[in-house]
Every structure is written in C-alpha cells, then in structure tokens.
C-alpha cells in the first residue's frame, strides 16, 4: 500500500515538473484561448504591432500596454496566463491587471517555441465586461516578447463572450427612416451632433440608395465633411473597371472641396471638405435629388457652415441609369479603422425631414435600428435609443447591454421646419 502511494506520488510529481519546465503552446482542454490579434494597444503609437498572422510583435516600448476585452457572465475565480515567444534564454517580466488586481510573472524564452507566463488567480466579483491589461516591466528597447494569446481557465464559452476574429472594429450601426408609401423624396434633411470623437469615426447623417453624406474624424488633426455617390453597375472594388456610361459625373463643387474616385465598397464619386467640426456642436446636412429625365438624376449634398452661417454646396453628381428620387433613407455610425474599436463612439441624430417633389415638408419621427455582420455575434456593444428628443447611435467601448436589430424607436416631433436657402449647384 505504501509502495503504491509512493509510486503514485512520484508520477504526479513528475507530471507537475514537466508542466512547469516545458514550454507550453496549447491551453488546457477546458481553458479559453483568446488570440493576441484581437487585442488593442494603448497608446497605439508604434510601440508594438498587431497582425492577424503574428499577433502582437515588436513590443519594445514599455509604455505600450496590450488590452483584451471580454464579457464574463458569471463571477468567480479566473486563472490567467499569456502565451508568447522570446529568444532563447531571454527573460521578460510582465504584469497583468484584471478587475483591479495586478499579478507579475517572469518568463524565460525558448526560441521559436511558445512559453507561458502564468499570472495565477484573479477574483471577478461581478458579471460584465472585463479589461485584461498586459504591461511590460522591462527596460524600454528590450523585447517583451511576441504575444500569441491570452489564456483563461475557470470559465467556459457558455458563460463568456469574446471576439475571436481579427476584425477589431466596433460594429457599424444604422438608423433606417420609413417614408410614407408613394412619396417622391426630393430632399432629405438631418441634424447630427458628434458626442464622442475617436479617430477613424464616420458619423453619417443623410444616406440613401445611391450615396451618403456626413462627417469624419480622420486623424488627431484632421476632420472632414464627406459626400459620396455610387456608380451604376456592379463593380465593387476598382473604378477603373467601370464603363463610362455607368460612372457618376461631377456637376459642381464648393470652395476648397476635393473631389475624386472611391472604391472597395462599391465605386463612385467622392468629395470632402477639410473642416475641424466641433464635438458637441450640431451640424446640418441636406441631400437633394433632381431627376433630369428617366435616365439621370443629379444628387447634391449641402452642409450648413457653422462659421459662415450659410449653406454650402459640397458637391453635385449626375448619376446614370437612375431618373428617380431619394429612396432607402438612413443614417449610420462607422468605425472605419480597426486599431481603436475598443473606444466608444456616439452621435445624436435629430429633426429629420423630407421634402416631396410637390414641395411639401414631412417630418420623420421613427427610426429602425440595424447593424452590420460584426454586430451579429462578434461585437454586441451596439445601441440605439432616444436622448433629449433625438435618436442616438452608440457602439464600441465594450459597454453593457445591446439593442436588438430591427427594433424601432419614435422620437418626439419638433415641428421645426428646416430653414434652407441653397446655392445652385
């Protein structure tokens, strides 16, 4: 009996020794492995890189942190580790913070083999989204390792929600505006206010079946008012492949407005005005349709310049194989760069009106919420609602809750007809 117990103890000890001393690249069967290519960098200023092929690489700036976000639907104990690669015998000291608890780990490299930095147990006191913050405690310039994955034990896929795909953008979210049946829409007016303003944000006010009109945050120092109209035909990527009789043609543009081509999301004519629109300040947009015959329609985008206090033409385009009015009216909010999909975006959309071909103004007070495929299951932090009498769209930030796709909301009518005096295109 004593011999059997001794043999059993030696076997167990040998197993534990092997686990500790052997580089590990595979998580335990019941553990979750969250790929490093789903993480974010903070700040994202070149201190490391993230790619779908290699995860987090070139991490030599000790001020750069690696962040993962996920929803834990039940409280409890969580054992956390990080898989990484380091040069042979190189050391890296790392710190992981979860739920206001920080643990350190030192790991020795094994060349091309993966090693595991084990941070031990963390107590998650309440369900909800959690941030996993990985920091380097190494000297700046020293490699902290190439990160492959965050590994969680103590949870299962049934009570967690993470995005496992390399697309790190927040879900795109939309407002669809129903219009009375049989209405010929000659103009669509919408007021919009950016509440949050992270880089790579497109707040779009006036969209229709042939284009969209709104404002972007393109960099920390550049913002734009943007108006685009799609070509006819089915080309989705390269405008050089679009036949001339399918191309939209520029008819006019405003002062200092750039015009050109766009592709990769359909093709067409693009225009933008560089303007430092202000967060929290209402912007006013109107798009018009002028059918010239049964074949062509001229679409024009006008924006109210808040400094000049007058309406300005952004651009005007003649669309072939059209001849109709504005259809499929909508607004959206888009995170068009994936490196900062963890930051919340929010805008207000209000006082929507349409003008019929007979000159009658009708107020639109109902909107229907939808989202893109990312919002279906990968990113659930997407919302619509009514705030201060206006619709709002919000996405990103890993905030609690979500709005169901297809849900409609009413807003209170304002009765405030648009005061519009448009310049000719």
Locations of regions flagged by a protein language model:
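N-terminal secretory signal peptides that target proteins for export/translocation
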Residues: 1-5
């Amino acid at each position: 009996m004593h011999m059997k117990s001794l043999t059993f103890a030696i076997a167990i000890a040998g197993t534990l020794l092997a686990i500790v001393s052997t580089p590990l690249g595979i998580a335990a069967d019941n553990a979750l492995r969250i790929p490093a290519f789903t993480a974010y960098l903070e700040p994202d200023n070149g201190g490391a890189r993230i790619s779908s092929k290699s995860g987090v690489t070139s991490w030599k700036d000790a001020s750069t942190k690696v962040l993962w976000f996920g929803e834990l639907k039940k409280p409890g104990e969580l054992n956390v580790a990080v898989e990484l690669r380091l040069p042979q015998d190189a050391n890296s000291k790392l710190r992981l913070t979860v739920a206001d608890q920080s643990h350190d780990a030192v790991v020795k490299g094994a060349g091309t083999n993966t090693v595991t930095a084990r941070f031990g147990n963390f107590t998650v006191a309440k369900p909800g989204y959690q941030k996993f913050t990985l920091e380097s405690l190494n000297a700046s310039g020293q490699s902290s390792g190439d990160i492959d994955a965050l590994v969680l034990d103590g949870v299962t896929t049934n009570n967690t929600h993470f995005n496992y795909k390399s697309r790190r953008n927040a879900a795109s979210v939309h407002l669809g505006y129903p219009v009375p049946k049989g209405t010929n829409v000659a103009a669509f007016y919408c007021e919009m206010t950016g509440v949050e303003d992270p880089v790579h944000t497109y707040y779009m006010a006036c969209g229709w079946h042939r284009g969209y009109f709104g404002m972007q945050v393109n960099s920390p120092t550049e913002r734009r008012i943007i108006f685009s109209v799609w070509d006819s035909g089915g080309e989705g990527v390269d405008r050089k492949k679009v036949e001339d009789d399918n191309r939209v043609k520029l008819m006019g543009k405003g002062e200092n407005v750039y015009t050109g081509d766009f592709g990769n999301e359909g093709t067409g004519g693009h225009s933008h005005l560089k303007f430092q629109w202000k967060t929290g300040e209402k912007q006013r947009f109107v798009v018009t349709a002028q059918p010239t015959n049964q074949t062509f329609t001229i679409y024009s985008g006008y924006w109210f310049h808040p400094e000049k206090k007058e309406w300005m033409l952004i651009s005007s385009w003649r669309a072939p194989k059209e001849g109709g009015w504005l259809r499929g009216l909508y607004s959206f909010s888009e995170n068009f760069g994936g490196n900062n999909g963890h930051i919340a975006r929010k805008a207000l959309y209000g006082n929507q009106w349409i003008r019929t071909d007979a000159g009658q103004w009708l107020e639109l007070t109902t909107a229907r919420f939808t989202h893109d495929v990312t919002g279906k299951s990968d990113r659930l932090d997407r919302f619509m609602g009514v705030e201060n009498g206006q619709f709002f769209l919000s996405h990103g930030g890993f905030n609690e809750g979500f709005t169901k796709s297809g849900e409609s909301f009413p807003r209170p009518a304002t009765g405030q007809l648009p005061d519009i005096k448009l310049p000719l295109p």
